[in-house]
């Protein structure tokens, strides 16, 4: 996004930080379901949930070497989590993560736009309201 043409809140939705946070949210949601289904041990899920994180600089560094954004992201997350990270991304493709995370970002951006439209609607309905001005 071009910063000078973007509202700060909308820029945040499309930031690298939020993109990776959305990816992590998707990965954690899948791990949680696998745990509920008994496919990930509860102790490993607890470790994943408690330790999962990422470092954007590290992701960039790894991506420069492996030339794959999701592998770079997963490697960074694995460095935070440790051995239990073997369950992260289990049975998933890169598209599963990217597409779902994009949907989360689109929903967030859409909600923001709708809230802005609500303000415009309220302003418009009060446009002809008589007001008293003091000079």
Positions of predicted regions on the chain:
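A helix-coil-helix interface module used to build multimeric assemblies
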Residues: 1-127
